[in-house]
Structures are given as C-alpha cells and as structure tokens.
C-alpha cells in the first residue's frame, strides 16, 4: 500500500507542478511580443521562403509563429508595430506620471515588469494601450504608404452631404483593427479568466481608436469661399486615445469568470466575463476589466516588481494624487533646492537664426521619504 500511496502522491505533485508551470508560461507569453520594442532596426524585408528563418534580430524570437508569419506577409509593418509600441509606452508614462504607479519600464524582454502577472487595473491599461498603439500606428502607416499590403481607405467615395463629398486619403482603421487583432491576440492562450481579461482589454484599446476617428475636410471655391468641401476620416491623436483609456482605467470593472454551461447543439461560446458585484451592469466592449486588487505601490516589492515611491517628486500644495500626502503614502517628504540653467529671452534674427540668453533659476523640489 505504501508504494502505491507514494506513487499516487508523486503523481499529484507532478500534476500540480505542471499546472503551475503552465499558468506561469501563459502569463509570461501574453506580452512577449512587447519585446519587439528592442529591435535594433525595424526594417523587415523578409523573404517568404520557408527555408529561410524569420529571425533577423534576437527580439523577434519572442514572437509566435503566427506573428512572424504576419510580419513576413506585410513588408514594412514591423516598423509600424515598433512605433506603435513606443507611442504606447510614452503615453502610459505620461498618463500615470503623477500616480504611485507611474508605468515604469525596463530594457529587458518583459518591458512592463512583473506587474503584468497580476490581473489588476494597471495590467488592464497596459494591454489596452499597447493594443491601441499597434492599431493606431498600422492604420496611419497604411495611409502614408509605409506598408506594402495596405493603402488609404478609399471606400468612402461620392456625395456625403449637401455641400461636401467624400475624397482624399482616409486612415485605414479597418486594416489596423484586423491586423491588430490577429497579431496582438494571437499571443493569448487558454480559456481562463486572465485570457478573457486580456482579450477584452486588447479589444477595448482597438475600439477606442476606432470610436475616436474624426472627419476632416478641405474647402474648395473662389477665394476660399468653401462652396464645396472634400472630406475624409482621420485618426485621433494618440493623446486623445490615452485620455479616453485613462478615464476607463479610473472606472474599470472588476469581473469574475462566468460560465452559462455547455451548449453543444449551438456551439455558442459560453465563457464570458461577469461583474463581481451582481448589481453592476456588465462591462461594455470599451470598458477596461480586471479581477485582482492592485498593490499599493508605496514600497518596494520584488514579487510584483514595484519600486515604491521613495525619491519621487511630489506637489506639496496639491490634495490630489500627485500631492505629497498621497504620493508619499504618509511617510513625509524632504525639500531641497537646485539651480537650473535654461535658455531665455530668445530673439529671432532675419535671416535666419535665433539667439538666446542663459538664465539660472532656483527650483524648490519636494521628494518622498
């Protein structure tokens, strides 16, 4: 009996260990494609020959087979992906510049750190903004002629209104959304709560870019009378996308894993997200969702990869999140002065140069203890 008990116990431990490893790999694989931001050169004049390996840079080894195939099928698109990811990183840092979590990044493969291993609000924003970055950049690159497989969106043609008509070069948001969905979502594996959360937030980012598209027009007529206008659809600024997603971050929905039961007859997907609080309405496609409480980000935590707020500059006169009381988590702050030299009293001289003086000012800084 004892040998049999030992074997059963050993088998149980092996299954648990394998399950834990699988979950860890699933978490880490979700954002592996972010590593393309470290690509030294974003040119991707890649052959379509099966015998030639699609790895011109070590960072591309982080991509799945499907993602590498998509890059090979769309020459020029790797530069667009890289640019979109760069924009997403900058926007994330700007939106959270005054928060305890200020969207820190690293130079390694996992550029956003260990926080993405948690199902919290911050992870939701990271997935949404990076997905939006790819869609936005690819759609813009199509209209600029930077990608061989797409062009402007010319579907809108002919009369549009009483004094205007469709024309010009609309940004190709449809190609950006389709490519973004195939490229970004292909890194998600499984059918668990984290999978549903990441897929939902990825789509929320793409939907935000689409919903914020604006109509632009150019006037035609004698002396600028604007008797007739030619109009096209233009992408929003990425700052507008970031502002929208930041609002969704503040109002994010906490969700649980919902399962209506199997339905073999209709083959309908029964797994879905439900609000943790049954009195709340289900999240909309543009809402951000999370399932785990965020760390407080006040002190260093190696498990979550948070560095704390010690040494951060705070605003002593603010009662908001950037104020010293909240940002420093009640630990207090130190005040110091520093001398800063800046260019000032600049004058333009015809033609063509600008002359400036150097002005030295004293700045007062408050840093969290």
UniProtKB/Swiss-Prot annotation:
PANTHER family: PROTO-ONCOGENE WNT-1, WNT RELATED. GO terms for biological process: canonical Wnt signaling pathway; cell fate commitment; neuron differentiation. Ligand for members of the frizzled family of seven transmembrane receptors. Acts in the canonical Wnt signaling pathway by promoting beta-catenin-dependent transcriptional activation. Plays an essential role in the development of the embryonic brain and central nervous system (CNS). Has a role in osteoblast function, bone development and bone homeostasis. Residues 263-285 are annotated as: Disordered. A lipid is attached at residue 223 (O-palmitoleoyl serine). The keyword Disulfide bond applies. Disulfide bonds join 92-103, 142-150, 152-169, 217-231, 219-226, 298-329, 314-324, 328-368, 344-359, 346-356, 351-352. Belongs to the Wnt family. One of its GO terms (molecular function) is cytokine activity. Keywords: Developmental protein, Disulfide bond, Extracellular matrix, Glycoprotein, Lipoprotein, Secreted, Signal, Wnt signaling pathway. It is found in: Secreted, Extracellular space, Extracellular matrix; Secreted. This is Protein Wnt-1. Residues 1-19 form the signal peptide. Glycans are attached at residues 28, 315, 358. The keyword Plastid does not apply. Palmitoleoylation is required for efficient binding to frizzled receptors. Palmitoleoylation is necessary for proper trafficking to cell surface. Depalmitoleoylated by NOTUM, leading to inhibit Wnt signaling pathway. It comes from the Eukaryota. GO terms for cellular component: extracellular space.
């Amino acid at each position: 009996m004892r040998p049999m008990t030992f074997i059963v116990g050993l088998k149980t431990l092996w299954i648990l260990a394998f399950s834990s490893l699988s979950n860890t790999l699933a978490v880490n694989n979700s954002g592996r494609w972010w590593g393309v931001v470290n690509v030294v050169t974003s040119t991707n004049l890649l052959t379509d020959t099966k015998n030639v390996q699609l790895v011109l840079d070590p960072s591309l080894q982080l991509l799945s087979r499907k993602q590498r195939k998509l890059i090979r099928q769309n020459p020029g698109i790797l530069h667009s992906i890289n640019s979109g990811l760069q924009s997403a990183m900058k926007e994330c840092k700007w939106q959270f510049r005054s928060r305890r979590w200020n969207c820190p990044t690293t130079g390694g493969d996992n550029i956003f750190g260990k926080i993405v291993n948690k199902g919290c609000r911050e992870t939701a924003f990271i997935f949404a903004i990076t997905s939006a970055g790819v869609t936005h950049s690819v759609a813009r690159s199509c209209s600029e002629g930077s990608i061989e497989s797409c062009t402007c969106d010319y579907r809108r043609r002919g009369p549009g209104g009483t004094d205007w008509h469709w024309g010009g070069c609309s940004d190709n948001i449809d190609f950006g959304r389709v490519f973004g969905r195939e490229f970004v979502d292909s890194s998600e594996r499984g059918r668990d709560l984290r999978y549903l959360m990441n897929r939902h937030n990825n789509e929320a980012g793409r939907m935000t870019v689409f919903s914020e598209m604006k109509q632009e027009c150019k006037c035609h007529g004698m002396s600028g009378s604007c008797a007739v206008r030619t109009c096209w659809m233009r992408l929003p600024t990425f700052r507008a996308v970031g502002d929208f997603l930041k609002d969704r971050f503040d109002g994010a929905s906490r969700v649980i894993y919902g399962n209506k039961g199997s339905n073999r007859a209709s083959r309908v997907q029964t797994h879905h997200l439900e609000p943790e609080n049954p009195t709340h309405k289900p999240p909309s496609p543009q809402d951000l969702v999370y399932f785990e409480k965020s760390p407080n980000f006040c002190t260093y935590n190696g498990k979550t990869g948070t560095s704390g707020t010690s040494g951060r500059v705070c605003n002593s006169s603010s009662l908001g999140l950037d104020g010293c009381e909240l940002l420093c988590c009640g630990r207090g702050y130190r005040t110091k002065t520093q001398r800063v030299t800046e260019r000032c009293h600049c004058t333009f001289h015809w033609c063509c140069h600008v002359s400036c003086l150097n002005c030295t000012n004293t700045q007062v800084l408050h840093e969290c203890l």
